[in-house]
């Protein structure tokens, strides 16, 4: 079984207009209550073209680190250190809080258009980095190391560094749009190439993230 470390789960919850009680949340007493509940190091409010955003970073809820929380008029962006269960638990606590501070209790049964997820992690695989690109390309690049040297006293080496793909979406509904997401499977920066430690970012929740990586390793001829 693969050992996923440094996992971060992120989600964007997109709501119909006038669902989120942002005006209520911007009240000092409610902001302070939220800051206390999540042990945030600080909360700030930004205004851009008459649109307010509440931004909080680095907190904790029930032992789960919360990396970021951003709330605007129609969406909640939440990132926690952990898996989908940790993310969902944090969201539910937030949703109940937003329900309680709103006399209309709109977040009790919110009109949620869609939720998009992202998960990142580091994981050791039995796949050499070079296997991610065509052998012809690696052979060509390595044949040019002499001309890539800045001077005769240096030795140039070429290693794979970054590898990302863009995932585009076309929603079935026309009331909202989705921005493209990034799918990344690349060498983890600062690690020994011999260890084959990868940084992986997928536009999915953590369960699918794990499944994609496991199937990727099998497809690339790793551990059977």
Segments from the language model and where they lie:
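Non-transmembrane, amphipathic alpha-helical segments
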Residues: 82, 86, 201-204
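Short, surface-exposed beta-strand/loop "edge" segments at domain boundaries and coil↔beta transitions
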Residues: 17-22, 61-66, 84-91, 131
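Short amphipathic beta-strand starts and helix->beta connectors
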Residues: 61-66, 101-107, 183
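C-terminal interaction module
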Residues: 1-45, 126-224
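Glycine-rich, often proline-containing surface loops adjacent to acidic residues and nearby aromatics
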Residues: 3-14, 67-84, 113-122, 191-194
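Noncatalytic linker/hinge segments flanking ATPase motor cores
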Residues: 49-57, 119-124, 163-170
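Surface-exposed beta-loop interaction hotspot
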Residues: 83-147
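Short, intrinsically disordered low-complexity segments
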Residues: 40-85
